[in-house]
């Protein structure tokens, strides 16, 4: 209507761009902002929002140019400084990001977003105390800011403050990242304190397959108290968890009737189990295996491995199904794996479940190493059988994916290659147990040293086994 009344209105086109952006129509939003600039070339807010859209499209250089144009027209625009900081951070230019956030905060010291985003960059740099301080400043301004609570929880967990970190993690449902995945029941959540005697509890998965497996290690603690335990999880996990926890009712996740259900007394998201059993979780590093694939299938895979040649038999995985920009530093290339792959006298087995064919060919062509792949195994969906294969292997080498959680769960020796500055570099989100050895790299380091150390470990184990 505004454009019909005044078709040369820069403000009207700008507002239209904002509406289109909110609706996810990014190209149309840029077109509307550009029309606003036709009528007012010095419209700093339009340049700023073009930058936001370009960043949403992962066009970071173009976004930075748009933010710089906005700042040239409006030098005291705290929002544009914060936005360009976000773009620098997405590029990995962390120092530039910090400079931009500090400039934003010098103009608007009460920006919870700038404090929170700067804290996240501090965490990526491994400056966890600075991250905790920045998150705390954001929360002093707005105590209900869910994103800051969520980020603070990761920082606290990563410095070993388990109790406080787990308390903060309960705020995740007010974070923009998690709010849409929250389930809504008429029954109140279990608070972790009230007795579960003669009570039925529903535990529901909330994140990835690996997280569900990791948190399932707490199920014996629940079943020792509750009359009945229902677990709703990813459908492909149902066979593995049902076999491993026969006294738990394991079902595929179903959200269709949440507010009408009456088959339990209290629900709880699985990510809250560690908080409910904090003292027991602190001893988890010494816990036994908790996943139990079929022994007949373990023997099948062991015999199949033996038929392929001499051991040790080493499974490898180097990336995830989710390779978003934020997660990329968690993952390695096949070239990074070369210190392990060139070990003599080792039979390598592929445990990668997505996008592996080209990588296996590259390993064969560049290193002359065969990584055996079982075409008859659905690595992505048949997790009960994958667990049996993992249990048959001698060693598993993996970055962050479902694989090290399965291998840790079945008790196979696991060499876990981890990005130290990852928000998830803690016991809540990492595989732990007596069979897990963690090898960390810093943001500013390559993976080479990590896989070199893993290779040395495997070589020593191979020597020990041969002597035995």
Each predicted region: which residue ranges?
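Alpha-helical solenoid repeat scaffolds of the TPR/TPR-like class and their adjacent stem/linker regions
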Residues: 1-396, 400-468
